[in-house]
Amino acid sequence: MHWADVIAADLLKRSNSHRIATGISPSGHIHLGNLREMVTADAIRRALLDAGGEAKIVYIADDFDPLRRRYPFLPEEYENYVGMPLCKIPDPEGCHDSYSEHFLQPFLESLEILGIPVEVRRAYQMYSEGLYENNTRIALKRRDEIARIIAEVTGRELEERWYPFMPLCENCGRINSTRVTSFDENWIYYECDCGHSGRVGYVGGGKLTWRVDWAARWQILSITCEPFGKDHAAAGGSYDTGVRIAREIFDYEPPYPVPYEWIHLKGKGAMKSSKGIVLPVREMVEVIPPEIVRYITIRVKPERHIEFDPGLGLLDLVEEFEEKFKEKDRSVELSLVGEVVYSDVPFRHLIVVGQIANWDLEKALEIIERTGYTVDDVTRRDVERRLKYARKWLEKYAPDNIKFEIPEKVTAEFSEEEKKFLRAYAERLRSDMKPEEIHTLVYDVSKEVGIKSSKAFQAIYKAILGKTYGPRVGYFIKSLGVEWVRERIKAAL
């Protein structure tokens, strides 16, 4: 049973209708690591619907969070905006209304491409519309109880003057440098490190501290399930305090937790916008088919960490998906977006074919047919769609040894044993051979003429590409055309 179906079954024991929360701060490029939360939520949503339940995903954009520091990708003047809410900071490139929208909009567009429908809630708007007003009043009045809960759960004593609220300074515009001094029914009074003292209202005048805000939004948005990163799930972490604050302060049953592990970028570690270790989601959905982007997360349980390699590792992942597609695997089913067709043509083959055909669809289909595949309507639709991704992947993530161009003339020099092998190999090549037979022939002929098979393969690549490496020989020669290759070898010698 797939992990999403297991969670859905548990949720349906509680209720038939569910609201699944997701929340990401738009403080930088929203990346593949962040996307795990969204895809996990959507897999659960789909599993609930398949089981006869009702489900909706609520995405909370934490745009009321402060800019914590000037990240490496920001210009120096953004030092002046540290501590201000993301929604109040200008877009670094001047193309959106605010800093937060600059990173949020491409992400929301990506969610649409990935088939993830969400109810979008912006934190600042929620506070400004008064949705948090009642919870803010309760939290301030019961701050001693909240402080006790936090101390009991985390072992961390809060100072006596602590309040669960961060006022927005009317003077400097910062939200992380203020302290509440007192409150009454109408106002919350504060002082700020900038030297200003003032008061703000309960609607839009600031925000609850994180652990209290999280518990409050569960109640405000009627959340019943939420995936979140393993840091929040640690003993004494945000979820543990949130559970008690929700129950004891806001009288709300906390949502079903789905903690997940990080996605690591191979050779670089966990993805973090602040450190520049990212694969922006908007970039990913342009280079990789949406079903593969989803499959990265859906194929493994949330508690398992993912090591992602956008280079050759991705080709292995796509190959796995292609095999599972034929088996009607549940992970594949939960990954598909819309009506997607897959032919028998592997993605790896499209990468080779595309380069030979110079990415021309009709030429590519001719080559595909020549290499033994049936070209019907399904193949045409599949190749037309995935050939575009193959080209973008090659340009963006492929290692150099996958890329090739066929020069008009070959200027490589050959040893006598290489020449002997190439002549014998060209003589034995036949147009009716299958790719596997063409590949095996290299071993047969190299043995007969007394040359190492590795040297034999290098000789073929030198004759065709002018370098000592290239795609798998059998499919490569069949794609180019046996007669063309025979003439090429003769010309090279």
UniProtKB/Swiss-Prot annotation:
The keyword Transit peptide does not apply. It catalyses: tRNA(Lys) + L-lysine + ATP = L-lysyl-tRNA(Lys) + AMP + diphosphate. InterPro entries: aa-tRNA-synth_I_cd-bd (IPR045462), aa-tRNA-synth_I_codon-bd_sub2 (IPR020751), aa-tRNA-synth_I_CS (IPR001412), aa_tRNA-synth_I_cd-bd_sf (IPR008925), Lys-tRNA-ligase (IPR002904), Lys-tRNA-ligase_SC_fold (IPR042078), Rossmann-like_a/b/a_fold (IPR014729). One of its GO terms (cellular component) is cytoplasm. A motif ('KMSKS' region) lies at residues 270-274. Its EC number is 6.1.1.6. Signal peptide: none annotated. Coiled coil: none annotated. Keywords: Aminoacyl-tRNA synthetase, ATP-binding, Cytoplasm, Ligase, Nucleotide-binding, Protein biosynthesis. GO terms for biological process: lysyl-tRNA aminoacylation. One of its GO terms (molecular function) is tRNA binding. The keyword Signal does not apply. It is found in: Cytoplasm. It is an enzyme of class 6 (ligase). A motif ('HIGH' region) lies at residues 26-34. Belongs to the class-I aminoacyl-tRNA synthetase family. This is Lysine--tRNA ligase. It comes from Archaeoglobus fulgidus (strain ATCC 49558 / DSM 4304 / JCM 9628 / NBRC 100126 / VC-16).
